[in-house]
Protein backbone atom coordinates (compact mmCIF):
# COMPACT_ATOMS: atom_id res chain seq x y z
CA UNK A 1 0.00 0.00 0.00
CA UNK A 2 2.73 2.46 0.99
CA UNK A 3 4.73 1.29 -2.03
CA UNK A 4 1.90 2.23 -4.38
CA UNK A 5 1.11 5.49 -2.58
CA UNK A 6 4.59 6.88 -2.01
CA UNK A 7 6.92 5.45 -4.66
CA UNK A 8 5.19 7.38 -7.51
CA UNK A 9 6.11 10.58 -5.63
CA UNK A 10 9.81 9.78 -6.20
CA UNK A 11 9.66 11.70 -9.48
CA UNK A 12 9.19 14.92 -7.49
CA UNK A 13 10.67 13.99 -4.10
CA UNK A 14 13.83 11.87 -4.22
CA UNK A 15 13.30 10.79 -0.62
CA UNK A 16 10.56 8.40 -1.74
CA UNK A 17 12.94 6.66 -4.13
CA UNK A 18 13.88 4.33 -1.25
CA UNK A 19 10.55 2.55 -1.69
CA UNK A 20 11.83 0.83 -4.82
CA UNK A 21 14.46 -1.04 -2.79
CA UNK A 22 13.48 -4.47 -1.49
CA UNK A 23 16.04 -4.24 1.30
CA UNK A 24 14.46 -1.05 2.65
CA UNK A 25 10.92 -2.40 2.52
CA UNK A 26 11.93 -5.78 3.98
CA UNK A 27 13.62 -4.15 6.95
CA UNK A 28 10.69 -1.85 7.63
CA UNK A 29 8.19 -4.68 7.25
CA UNK A 30 10.17 -6.46 9.96
CA UNK A 31 10.24 -3.39 12.20
CA UNK A 32 6.53 -2.74 11.64
CA UNK A 33 5.66 -6.33 12.56
CA UNK A 34 7.81 -6.18 15.68
CA UNK A 35 6.33 -2.87 16.86
CA UNK A 36 2.82 -4.10 16.11
CA UNK A 37 3.45 -7.17 18.26
CA UNK A 38 4.70 -5.01 21.14
CA UNK A 39 1.73 -2.64 20.89
CA UNK A 40 -1.11 -5.09 20.24
CA UNK A 41 0.32 -8.14 22.05
CA UNK A 42 -0.72 -7.28 25.64
CA UNK A 43 -4.29 -6.52 24.49
CA UNK A 44 -4.48 -9.83 22.59
CA UNK A 45 -3.30 -11.78 25.64
CA UNK A 46 -5.88 -10.05 27.88
CA UNK A 47 -8.61 -10.67 25.32
CA UNK A 48 -7.78 -14.37 25.08
CA UNK A 49 -7.85 -14.61 28.87
CA UNK A 50 -11.26 -12.90 28.92
CA UNK A 51 -12.56 -15.40 26.35
CA UNK A 52 -11.13 -18.18 28.53
CA UNK A 53 -9.24 -19.48 25.52
CA UNK A 54 -6.96 -21.49 27.75
CA UNK A 55 -4.69 -24.35 26.76
CA UNK A 56 -5.83 -27.81 27.85
CA UNK A 57 -2.81 -29.83 29.00
CA UNK A 58 -2.61 -33.57 28.36
CA UNK A 59 -2.46 -35.60 31.56
CA UNK A 60 -0.35 -38.30 29.90
CA UNK A 61 2.45 -35.86 29.09
CA UNK A 62 5.40 -34.69 31.21
CA UNK A 63 4.32 -33.64 34.72
CA UNK A 64 6.11 -30.31 34.34
CA UNK A 65 3.49 -29.31 31.76
CA UNK A 66 0.66 -29.37 34.29
CA UNK A 67 1.73 -25.93 35.53
CA UNK A 68 0.97 -24.59 32.04
CA UNK A 69 -2.71 -25.37 32.55
CA UNK A 70 -4.78 -22.24 31.95
CA UNK A 71 -2.21 -20.39 29.82
CA UNK A 72 -4.03 -18.54 27.00
CA UNK A 73 -3.75 -20.07 23.54
CA UNK A 74 -4.78 -18.98 20.01
CA UNK A 75 -2.02 -16.35 20.17
CA UNK A 76 -1.34 -17.15 16.54
CA UNK A 77 -3.98 -14.52 15.78
CA UNK A 78 -1.39 -11.94 16.84
CA UNK A 79 1.20 -13.53 14.54
CA UNK A 80 -1.17 -13.42 11.57
CA UNK A 81 -1.99 -9.75 12.14
CA UNK A 82 1.71 -8.93 12.46
CA UNK A 83 2.47 -10.67 9.15
CA UNK A 84 -0.50 -9.60 7.05
CA UNK A 85 -0.63 -5.90 8.00
CA UNK A 86 3.08 -5.09 7.35
CA UNK A 87 2.98 -7.12 4.13
CA UNK A 88 -0.01 -5.13 2.88
CA UNK A 89 1.75 -1.90 3.87
CA UNK A 90 5.20 -2.50 2.41
CA UNK A 91 4.88 -5.06 -0.41
CA UNK A 92 4.02 -4.56 -4.08
CA UNK A 93 0.40 -5.72 -4.05
CA UNK A 94 0.47 -6.34 -7.80
CA UNK A 95 2.77 -9.30 -7.18
CA UNK A 96 0.84 -12.57 -7.48
CA UNK A 97 3.31 -14.47 -5.27
CA UNK A 98 2.46 -12.19 -2.34
CA UNK A 99 -1.23 -13.02 -2.67
CA UNK A 100 -0.59 -16.76 -3.03
CA UNK A 101 1.42 -16.81 0.19
CA UNK A 102 -1.14 -14.68 2.02
CA UNK A 103 -3.85 -17.08 0.81
CA UNK A 104 -2.10 -19.98 2.51
CA UNK A 105 -1.31 -17.97 5.65
CA UNK A 106 -4.86 -16.72 6.10
CA UNK A 107 -6.52 -19.93 4.86
CA UNK A 108 -4.51 -22.20 7.16
CA UNK A 109 -4.88 -19.63 9.92
CA UNK A 110 -8.68 -19.72 9.65
CA UNK A 111 -8.57 -23.53 9.67
CA UNK A 112 -6.42 -23.52 12.81
CA UNK A 113 -8.62 -20.85 14.42
CA UNK A 114 -11.76 -22.97 13.94
CA UNK A 115 -9.98 -26.00 15.39
CA UNK A 116 -8.68 -24.03 18.39
CA UNK A 117 -12.04 -22.33 18.98
CA UNK A 118 -13.86 -25.64 19.11
CA UNK A 119 -11.32 -27.05 21.55
CA UNK A 120 -10.79 -24.21 24.01
CA UNK A 121 -13.91 -22.04 23.77
CA UNK A 122 -16.64 -24.53 22.89
CA UNK A 123 -14.86 -27.12 25.09
CA UNK A 124 -14.96 -29.76 22.36
CA UNK A 125 -11.72 -31.69 23.04
CA UNK A 126 -11.63 -33.20 19.55
CA UNK A 127 -11.96 -29.93 17.61
CA UNK A 128 -11.97 -30.52 13.89
CA UNK A 129 -11.40 -34.13 12.90
CA UNK A 130 -8.01 -35.00 11.34
CA UNK A 131 -9.84 -35.80 8.11
CA UNK A 132 -11.51 -32.37 8.03
CA UNK A 133 -8.23 -30.56 8.65
CA UNK A 134 -6.38 -32.59 6.05
CA UNK A 135 -9.12 -32.01 3.46
CA UNK A 136 -8.90 -28.22 3.71
CA UNK A 137 -5.11 -28.22 3.91
CA UNK A 138 -4.82 -30.34 0.77
CA UNK A 139 -7.49 -28.31 -1.04
CA UNK A 140 -5.70 -24.99 -0.46
CA UNK A 141 -2.23 -26.36 -1.20
CA UNK A 142 -3.40 -28.16 -4.34
CA UNK A 143 -5.04 -24.92 -5.47
CA UNK A 144 -1.66 -23.19 -5.26
CA UNK A 145 -0.03 -26.08 -7.12
CA UNK A 146 -2.59 -25.99 -9.93
CA UNK A 147 -2.28 -22.21 -10.26
CA UNK A 148 1.51 -22.38 -10.51
CA UNK A 149 1.37 -25.31 -12.94
CA UNK A 150 -0.61 -23.19 -15.39
CA UNK A 151 1.21 -19.92 -14.62
CA UNK A 152 3.14 -18.91 -17.77
CA UNK A 153 6.89 -18.99 -17.25
CA UNK A 154 6.86 -20.76 -13.87
CA UNK A 155 9.15 -23.78 -13.92
CA UNK A 156 7.90 -27.19 -12.81
CA UNK A 157 11.43 -28.57 -12.50
CA UNK A 158 12.88 -29.76 -9.20
CA UNK A 159 16.12 -28.06 -8.19
CA UNK A 160 18.62 -29.69 -5.84
CA UNK A 161 20.85 -27.53 -3.57
CA UNK A 162 24.12 -29.45 -4.04
CA UNK A 163 23.58 -30.55 -7.65
CA UNK A 164 22.80 -27.37 -9.52
CA UNK A 165 22.97 -28.92 -12.97
CA UNK A 166 20.44 -31.62 -12.06
CA UNK A 167 16.83 -30.47 -12.20
CA UNK A 168 14.34 -33.16 -13.28
CA UNK A 169 11.05 -32.08 -14.86
CA UNK A 170 8.10 -33.04 -12.65
CA UNK A 171 5.36 -32.31 -15.17
CA UNK A 172 1.89 -32.95 -13.78
CA UNK A 173 3.49 -34.47 -10.65
CA UNK A 174 4.41 -30.90 -9.72
CA UNK A 175 0.88 -30.40 -8.33
CA UNK A 176 0.96 -33.26 -5.76
CA UNK A 177 4.57 -32.33 -4.97
CA UNK A 178 3.56 -28.75 -4.11
CA UNK A 179 0.69 -30.11 -2.03
CA UNK A 180 3.04 -32.41 -0.13
CA UNK A 181 5.54 -29.63 0.59
CA UNK A 182 2.97 -27.13 1.89
CA UNK A 183 0.85 -29.61 3.87
CA UNK A 184 3.93 -31.39 5.21
CA UNK A 185 5.58 -28.16 6.36
CA UNK A 186 2.36 -26.99 8.00
CA UNK A 187 1.90 -30.16 10.03
CA UNK A 188 5.61 -30.42 10.89
CA UNK A 189 5.57 -26.97 12.51
CA UNK A 190 2.31 -27.90 14.24
CA UNK A 191 3.95 -30.98 15.79
CA UNK A 192 6.97 -28.94 16.89
CA UNK A 193 4.83 -26.44 18.80
CA UNK A 194 4.92 -28.27 22.13
CA UNK A 195 7.30 -26.22 24.29
CA UNK A 196 7.55 -22.51 25.05
CA UNK A 197 9.17 -20.81 22.07
CA UNK A 198 10.25 -24.10 20.50
CA UNK A 199 8.43 -23.58 17.19
CA UNK A 200 8.47 -19.80 16.79
CA UNK A 201 12.25 -19.49 17.16
CA UNK A 202 13.07 -21.86 14.26
CA UNK A 203 10.23 -20.35 12.21
CA UNK A 204 11.83 -16.90 12.50
CA UNK A 205 15.23 -18.34 11.55
CA UNK A 206 13.71 -20.16 8.57
CA UNK A 207 11.92 -16.99 7.46
CA UNK A 208 15.18 -15.03 7.68
CA UNK A 209 16.94 -17.65 5.57
CA UNK A 210 14.22 -17.59 2.93
CA UNK A 211 14.34 -13.79 2.94
CA UNK A 212 17.85 -14.12 1.52
CA UNK A 213 16.86 -16.79 -1.01
CA UNK A 214 13.78 -14.83 -2.12
CA UNK A 215 15.92 -11.77 -2.75
CA UNK A 216 18.47 -13.75 -4.77
CA UNK A 217 15.86 -15.76 -6.71
CA UNK A 218 14.18 -12.54 -7.83
CA UNK A 219 17.43 -10.98 -9.03
CA UNK A 220 18.50 -12.18 -12.49
CA UNK A 221 22.17 -11.24 -12.04
CA UNK A 222 22.62 -12.75 -8.56
CA UNK A 223 20.67 -15.93 -9.30
CA UNK A 224 22.67 -16.42 -12.50
CA UNK A 225 25.98 -15.95 -10.71
CA UNK A 226 25.02 -18.33 -7.87
CA UNK A 227 23.37 -20.79 -10.27
CA UNK A 228 20.02 -20.96 -8.55
CA UNK A 229 16.66 -20.70 -10.35
CA UNK A 230 15.68 -17.20 -11.40
CA UNK A 231 12.02 -16.61 -10.52
CA UNK A 232 10.79 -13.20 -11.73
CA UNK A 233 8.80 -11.55 -8.95
CA UNK A 234 10.08 -13.82 -6.17
CA UNK A 235 12.18 -10.99 -4.73
CA UNK A 236 9.04 -9.28 -3.45
CA UNK A 237 8.53 -12.20 -1.08
CA UNK A 238 11.52 -10.89 0.88
CA UNK A 239 9.16 -8.23 2.26
CA UNK A 240 6.77 -10.90 3.50
CA UNK A 241 9.69 -12.86 4.98
CA UNK A 242 10.77 -9.71 6.81
CA UNK A 243 7.28 -9.42 8.28
CA UNK A 244 7.46 -13.08 9.34
CA UNK A 245 10.77 -12.53 11.12
CA UNK A 246 9.42 -9.46 12.93
CA UNK A 247 6.17 -11.22 13.85
CA UNK A 248 8.10 -14.25 15.08
CA UNK A 249 10.41 -12.21 17.29
CA UNK A 250 7.49 -10.13 18.55
CA UNK A 251 5.51 -13.22 19.48
CA UNK A 252 8.57 -14.78 21.10
CA UNK A 253 8.52 -11.84 23.52
CA UNK A 254 5.36 -13.36 25.02
CA UNK A 255 5.94 -17.02 24.15
CA UNK A 256 9.44 -17.43 25.60
CA UNK A 257 9.79 -19.60 28.71
CA UNK A 258 7.65 -19.38 30.80
CA UNK A 259 5.09 -18.58 28.12
CA UNK A 260 2.36 -15.98 28.65
CA UNK A 261 0.52 -17.24 25.58
CA UNK A 262 0.66 -20.15 23.13
CA UNK A 263 0.21 -19.79 19.36
CA UNK A 264 -2.23 -22.69 18.96
CA UNK A 265 -3.07 -24.28 15.62
CA UNK A 266 -4.02 -20.87 14.22
CA UNK A 267 -0.34 -19.96 14.40
CA UNK A 268 1.49 -23.23 13.76
CA UNK A 269 -0.55 -24.37 10.75
CA UNK A 270 -0.32 -20.98 9.03
CA UNK A 271 3.40 -20.48 9.70
CA UNK A 272 4.29 -23.94 8.46
CA UNK A 273 2.13 -23.45 5.40
CA UNK A 274 3.87 -20.12 4.74
CA UNK A 275 7.32 -21.72 4.87
CA UNK A 276 6.21 -24.47 2.50
CA UNK A 277 4.79 -21.92 0.07
CA UNK A 278 7.96 -19.81 0.16
CA UNK A 279 10.00 -22.94 -0.59
CA UNK A 280 7.80 -23.74 -3.60
CA UNK A 281 7.78 -20.21 -5.00
CA UNK A 282 11.56 -19.83 -4.80
CA UNK A 283 12.15 -23.34 -6.22
CA UNK A 284 13.99 -24.21 -3.00
CA UNK A 285 11.76 -27.02 -1.73
CA UNK A 286 14.61 -29.40 -0.85
CA UNK A 287 16.36 -26.58 1.00
CA UNK A 288 13.45 -26.56 3.46
CA UNK A 289 14.44 -30.07 4.55
CA UNK A 290 17.83 -28.64 5.53
CA UNK A 291 16.97 -25.32 7.18
CA UNK A 292 13.76 -26.79 8.61
CA UNK A 293 15.57 -29.88 9.86
CA UNK A 294 14.15 -29.50 13.37
CA UNK A 295 10.62 -29.62 11.98
CA UNK A 296 11.50 -32.63 9.82
CA UNK A 297 12.93 -34.57 12.77
CA UNK A 298 9.92 -33.73 14.95
CA UNK A 299 7.52 -34.98 12.26
CA UNK A 300 9.56 -38.12 11.54
CA UNK A 301 9.72 -38.96 15.25
CA UNK A 302 5.91 -39.10 15.32
CA UNK A 303 5.72 -41.15 12.11
CA UNK A 304 8.31 -43.67 13.33
CA UNK A 305 6.74 -43.86 16.78
CA UNK A 306 3.27 -44.59 15.42
CA UNK A 307 4.59 -47.02 12.80
CA UNK A 308 6.75 -48.90 15.28
CA UNK A 309 3.96 -49.24 17.83
CA UNK A 310 1.46 -50.34 15.18
CA UNK A 311 3.62 -52.99 13.52
CA UNK A 312 6.05 -54.03 16.30
CA UNK A 313 4.07 -53.22 19.41
CA UNK A 314 7.06 -51.24 20.71
CA UNK A 315 7.83 -47.55 21.05
CA UNK A 316 11.08 -46.07 19.79
CA UNK A 317 10.90 -42.96 21.99
CA UNK A 318 9.56 -42.48 25.49
CA UNK A 319 7.09 -40.03 23.96
CA UNK A 320 6.66 -38.32 20.60
CA UNK A 321 7.27 -35.72 19.22
CA UNK A 322 10.91 -36.07 20.14
CA UNK A 323 11.11 -32.94 22.33
CA UNK A 324 8.89 -34.77 24.87
CA UNK A 325 11.32 -37.72 24.75
CA UNK A 326 14.11 -35.45 25.95
CA UNK A 327 11.86 -33.98 28.64
CA UNK A 328 11.09 -37.44 30.01
CA UNK A 329 14.83 -38.18 30.03
CA UNK A 330 15.23 -35.29 32.46
CA UNK A 331 16.50 -32.52 30.18
CA UNK A 332 15.12 -29.14 31.31
CA UNK A 333 12.61 -27.50 28.98
CA UNK A 334 14.62 -24.26 28.46
CA UNK A 335 17.70 -26.30 27.56
CA UNK A 336 15.78 -28.32 24.94
CA UNK A 337 14.39 -25.13 23.42
CA UNK A 338 17.73 -23.32 23.17
CA UNK A 339 19.48 -26.41 21.81
CA UNK A 340 16.86 -26.74 19.07
CA UNK A 341 17.37 -23.05 18.24
CA UNK A 342 21.13 -23.59 18.02
CA UNK A 343 20.63 -26.58 15.72
CA UNK A 344 18.35 -24.48 13.50
CA UNK A 345 20.93 -21.68 13.27
CA UNK A 346 23.59 -24.21 12.23
CA UNK A 347 21.23 -25.72 9.63
CA UNK A 348 20.44 -22.23 8.31
CA UNK A 349 24.16 -21.59 7.82
CA UNK A 350 24.48 -24.91 6.01
CA UNK A 351 21.54 -23.95 3.78
CA UNK A 352 23.11 -20.57 2.99
CA UNK A 353 26.43 -22.26 2.23
CA UNK A 354 24.74 -24.20 -0.59
CA UNK A 355 24.68 -20.94 -2.55
CA UNK A 356 28.38 -21.43 -3.28
CA UNK A 357 28.35 -25.23 -3.56
CA UNK A 358 28.13 -26.59 -7.09
Curated annotation (Swiss-Prot):
It is a multi-pass membrane protein. It is an enzyme of class 2 (transferase). The chain crosses the membrane at residues 24-44, 73-93, 95-115, 134-154, 169-189, 197-217, 233-253, 261-281, 286-306, 335-355. Its cofactor is Mg(2+). Pathway: Cell wall biogenesis; peptidoglycan biosynthesis. Keywords: Cell cycle, Cell division, Cell inner membrane, Cell membrane, Cell shape, Cell wall biogenesis/degradation, Magnesium, Membrane, Metal-binding, Peptidoglycan synthesis, Transferase, Transmembrane, Transmembrane helix. Signal peptide: none annotated. GO terms for molecular function: metal ion binding; phospho-N-acetylmuramoyl-pentapeptide-transferase activity; UDP-N-acetylmuramoyl-L-alanyl-D-glutamyl-meso-2,6-diaminopimelyl-D-alanyl-D-alanine:undecaprenyl-phosphate transferase activity. One of its GO terms (cellular component) is plasma membrane. Its EC number is 2.7.8.13. Its main location: membrane. It is found in: Cell inner membrane. GO terms for biological process: cell division; cell wall organization; peptidoglycan biosynthetic process; regulation of cell shape. It catalyses: UDP-N-acetyl-alpha-D-muramoyl-L-alanyl-gamma-D-glutamyl-meso-2,6-diaminopimeloyl-D-alanyl-D-alanine + di-trans,octa-cis-undecaprenyl phosphate = di-trans,octa-cis-undecaprenyl diphospho-N-acetyl-alpha-D-muramoyl-L-alanyl-D-glutamyl-meso-2,6-diaminopimeloyl-D-alanyl-D-alanine + UMP. Catalyzes the initial step of the lipid cycle reactions in the biosynthesis of the cell wall peptidoglycan: transfers peptidoglycan precursor phospho-MurNAc-pentapeptide from UDP-MurNAc-pentapeptide onto the lipid carrier undecaprenyl phosphate, yielding undecaprenyl-pyrophosphoryl-MurNAc-pentapeptide, known as lipid I. Belongs to the glycosyltransferase 4 family. MraY subfamily. This is Phospho-N-acetylmuramoyl-pentapeptide-transferase. It comes from Geobacter sp. (strain M21).
